[in-house]
Amino acid sequence: IEKTPYQLVKSNEWTFDKFSEIVKDIYEDAGDGAKSADDKFGYVIYDINIDAFQTAAGIVSIGKDESGDLTISPDFSGERQIDMVSKVNQLLNSQGVYYTNSIKVRNVFFEERALMITDRVFIVAGKDNRDDKNRIEFSYGIVPQPKYSADQESYMTNVGHPYTMYAINAASSKIDACSALLEAMGSENYRSVTPKVFEVAMKVRYASDSEAGEMYDLIRGGISFDLGRLFAETFGNHTANLFRKAAMNGTSYTTNYSAAKPVIES
């Protein structure tokens, strides 16, 4: 590697193609002649996190039309999306990449048998939120998901599925008051709590070097909220699954999208 990932990010060269070039051929067989979780890889990923590549390309599933009404984003079925599906499929099928539908794929990274992983930030504190016996003891770096191409304006980051949502009982006699209270709490937390999470927890506890702090600023600055992911069940889960399934299976995204479109629109 001529430049480190940090340098590539700062020089606007951290693109999907560069990332793929780095990881796709790094592989060492454990000795049984078959690709498995016991081998060494350039990159590993828990399959649900494949969604991050769609977001990183600046694509959302649901947007708004000129009237402000919700509609399927044209990017969701556009050329960039179709190309991204193809690129990710090729990456997933390369020798140096291993993916599975289990979070146990993290073990490969924790055991220092993978160069890179795409995952939630909390994994640096342990295998998962309930068990820190495999806390990372080696030096690591954190960078945003790679851009689709260098002409993309910024690095984009999707939010993981664990998030909190609040609801107000439809029978409440104080819906307006409850709504105002929730809005005020959310606004205050955004201004006072969220910055502390980044400045104290992430930039200190979840960083192994000073440059990681710069990366967290880029990651936070590019956070993308896609209503199609947040309310996926409303859209038959297609807005959350179409990209990932086509990328893993190598099936035609255009065909799958055409079949799912009536369900999404309904």
Q: Where on the chain are the PLM-derived regions?
A:
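A ligand-binding cleft/hinge motif common to bilobed small-molecule-binding domains
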Residues: 121-135
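Glycine-centered hinge/linker elements that transmit conformational signals in sensory
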Residues: 16, 20-25, 54-55, 61-102
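Acidic, glycine-anchored loop motifs typical of Ca2+
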Residues: 7, 30-39
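Conserved C-terminal helix/tail region of periplasmic/extracytoplasmic solute-binding proteins
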Residues: 172-179, 189-266
